[in-house]
Amino acid sequence: MRRLVVFAVLATLVATGTALAARGDPQRRITPADEARAKAMLVRQSDLPGSTAGAPTPNVDFYCPGLDASDLTLTGDANGRRFAVGLMIVASASEVYESRADAGAAWRRATGAEGVQCAKSLLGRQLAQQRGRLVSLRQIPFPRISDRTIAFRATMTATTPQGAVTAYVDVIALMRSRAHATITVGSALTTPPRSEELHLARTVAKRMANAMRGA
């Protein structure tokens, strides 16, 4: 769930929502069954007709004491590919924890005040390196479609040869049983379409429910 608070700003001015780092990461005891569950939850190209597929989302090293997850254990994780549709980019990621207690602890840390502050600091630094600026990062309303659901929106500006551009990145996080999944939707010039976000989130939530049934 640490990946909820990480946004790597891309050359396209759209951010992705996945990252892992060595320091503060959960312990890894990956099992084939939970790894398969994590992969089954991801957004697929067939979910986005007319999209083009890119590389998996990049990793970004970061550390915030309030998000230290070294006392928790992951048993599966997956990092999805990026998909582009017009000015919109979509990415997804998933994690399966050893226990519901670990999953709950990770969720609370990432969605609490320290998690949001970590995201603001990290995103601000990354944008500054690319001649950009973070305008705001805030929680936005989103319907509950899983055991737990939360969404955030980052608004940012960047300087391009064509002038200043505003970009928006929404991160929707879901928790089901021992699993977390994030869907990241980025868009330049206008906010991401809510109908598309709902479609993707409901699709992932259904896959999570199927993958975690009996687990």
Where does each model-flagged region fall?
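Positively charged n-region of N-terminal signal peptides that target proteins for export
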Residues: M1-L4
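Bacterial N-terminal signal peptides
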Residues: F7-T16
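Sec/Tat signal peptide C-region and signal peptidase I cleavage site
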Residues: G17-A21
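N-terminal "mature-domain start" segment
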Residues: A22-G86, A119-L134, R138, G214-A215
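A short, solvent-exposed beta-edge/loop patch
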Residues: D25-R28, Q45-D47, G132-M212
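Second-shell loop/turn segments in exported
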Residues: P32-D34, V90-E98, G186-R194
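Sec-exported extracytoplasmic/periplasmic mature domains
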Residues: V43, D47-A53, E98-D102, R108, ...
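A short acidic-to-branched-hydrophobic micro-motif
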Residues: D77-A113
